[in-house]
């Protein structure tokens, strides 16, 4: 395992330029961090790479280098993402970076310039491509040098994680994989598994955050530090609220209720007073995101000059996209530096919000957690409104990795010396739960591989029964189970040895 440090070194830079690769100094006009250079060096040695690093640390640059190198070789790159919104943003970013003619897009409902050298797509599209019967004269994987798996930690998603496993298992070995993941507890196991099922793979790990995070807690009494100076536990001034005797939570849980949550307008005002805006305010419901925009009432977060700039951009947008302008409440809120961003918003309106937020003209955007998935909307602060969420399998607490992914959106590299993460008192979760999540380690990746009838039919169309069975048995879950079996066998061997000595 490679443990990377944040500062670039001459030795690492020289190594990265070696082999059949492209000198990174020809691609980027700024010094690279060591972990980026080490990943580039591994790619130039012909290895696939797993890059595990905190959100906002610069992992995407490794994927961008793979693109520059493929273009220099006259080859292609597929860049996969978990979300259509992220694919659309990558299309815009890469067009600006590499030229319109070089970039295409494939999602479930859109196909743009699919023969381009760089094709951005959702991971499901890539998986389906691997299952499709390749035409002798039209192989979609021909000339593909590398596949970038952005947000690879989505392997943990209970509904969609299997797509990432299937993509890795079935990707042809000559194609290099660039797996970009947020910090996970078992990145070494992921790397070892990819090496077994795909080919030589190098793990690059960095735990360095370019912009450190400060955790705060907001209750009806105000905004206060959440953690102690060491960041290992609750701040001495944080008091865990205890319900009066006899007060019970309604419903099935016996957990006592917490104090009422502070109004959103109060939370935003507290942050504005401390110069903690712009902020992404995470709320796990589209309806409540829109409601929160209305709940801020007439609160204005922008100056007259900023308002004039928003007005000019909104007028130009309205002229070009009259059908995409949201109702009067949302347009009015936009003029005050407030917006909602979620899957129910038209893509063109979301693009406008992203543009204005990147320019610092929107001060608070209420968003569902999909915005934590790498969409380029860097903020000074993130606010996490609830420490539990409703899922298809019922209500559950946030996982540590989910919390860290949202928290990691705070802090803009090159703009902020500090990023701020604000957790908010809710009716049933308070400072204790916030402290536990803020100090919890990253979760390990687990296998979500689920052989479906469709998968089996796809495999049998292309392979014999024995080969199809062998491919299904390559899953990450089977690999992890094998590790447990090795440990059990070692324990049995030790017990047998002890018995023989009695």
State where each predicted segment sits:
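Conserved C-terminal RecA-like helicase domain
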Residues: 80, 95-104, 282, 286-364, ...
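Walker A/P-loop NTP-binding motif
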Residues: 41-48, 59-75, 165-171
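Conserved segment of the helicase C-terminal RecA-like domain
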Residues: 377, 381-439
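SF2 helicase catalytic motif II
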Residues: 119, 123-127, 134-179
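Helicase-associated low-complexity/disordered flanking segments
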Residues: 1-49, 75-76, 232, 304-335
